[in-house]
């Protein structure tokens, strides 16, 4: 996977790209990150990348020319997505990360700054993506989150691939509580079931805790999960009925 990050502040990425699993993945060439500064594509002596908005308004906008020139300087791979990090975009979630991993080999990520970008930049963009319903000073932090989320799903980044499926959001529910040694810390004890060695009981406890935690913290996710589960049950029932009796008929 190739990432081309268009940013006025490439130095922001140095530590993130050299640390932890992300740094190891880049060292193993599982992914490649290329940082491009639109200021390098300005043509005036002041290297100006922003200007006042037409019609008035607060703050400055990033000019379109340096962004277009920066993006157009990049190679175009066959499966490419051009993403603008924007609070108006689709919120990053696990299904989005999996879609990007499955469908693309190159992600061009444009980081806005100031009060945003000239709207004509959207002619370059195939998708707008947001970190959430709040405003930051620029698109760099959301871009880092996007890169991290995508890279950890690439084969070879995480040693134990089963850990990618046994975590929050992968099954539509939040993760269950987890504990390590000591079994008793300041009077807070690890639940007995986790010490029992009974794998079936542990699995049941974890499932129940997932539902409880999701209900307490993200009832919206629980409702969505329940609806999807119901829909899946109906579809399975219809398939089974069709398999046993041939066509499914309804009485008016």
Swiss-Prot record:
* Gene behind the chain: trmD
Where are the annotated segments for Disordered? 215-252
User: Which of UniProt's keywords are assigned here?
Assistant: Cytoplasm, Methyltransferase, S-adenosyl-L-methionine, Transferase, tRNA processing
Q: What class of enzyme is it?
A: transferase
UniProt-recorded name of the protein: tRNA (guanine-N(1)-)-methyltransferase
Keyword ATP-binding assigned:
no
State the species of origin.
Answer: Nostoc sp. (strain PCC 7120 / SAG 25.82 / UTEX 2576)
UniProt GO molecular function? tRNA (guanine(37)-N1)-methyltransferase activity
Instruction: Give one Pfam hit by family name.
Output: tRNA_m1G_MT
């Amino acid at each position: 996977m190739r990432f081309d990050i268009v940013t006025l502040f490439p130095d922001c990425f140095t530590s993130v790209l050299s640390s932890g699993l992300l740094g190891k993945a880049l060292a193993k060439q599982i992914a490649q990150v290329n940082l491009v500064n639109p200021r390098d594509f300005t043509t005036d002596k002041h290297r100006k990348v922003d200007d006042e908005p037409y019609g008035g308004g607060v703050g400055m906008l990033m000019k379109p020319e340096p962004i277009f020139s920066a993006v157009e300087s990049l190679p175009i791979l066959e499966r490419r997505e051009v993403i603008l990090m924007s609070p108006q975009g689709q919120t990053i979630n696990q299904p989005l990360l999996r879609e990007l991993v499955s469908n693309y080999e190159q992600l061009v990520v444009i980081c806005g700054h100031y009060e945003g970008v000239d709207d004509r930049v959207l002619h370059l963009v195939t998708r707008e993506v947001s970190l959430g319903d709040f405003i930051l000073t620029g698109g760099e932090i959301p871009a880092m989150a996007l890169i991290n989320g995508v890279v950890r799903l690439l084969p070879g980044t995480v040693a134990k691939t089963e850990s990618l499926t046994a975590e929050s959001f992968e099954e539509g529910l939040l993760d269950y509580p987890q504990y390590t040694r000591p079994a008793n810390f300041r009077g807070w004890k690890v639940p007995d079931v986790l010490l029992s060695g009974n794998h079936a009981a542990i699995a049941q406890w974890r499932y129940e805790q997932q539902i409880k935690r999701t209900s307490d913290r993200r009832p919206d996710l629980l409702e969505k999960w329940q609806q999807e589960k119901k829909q899946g049950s109906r579809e399975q029932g219809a398939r089974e009925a069709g398999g046993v009796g041939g066509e499914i008929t309804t009485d008016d």
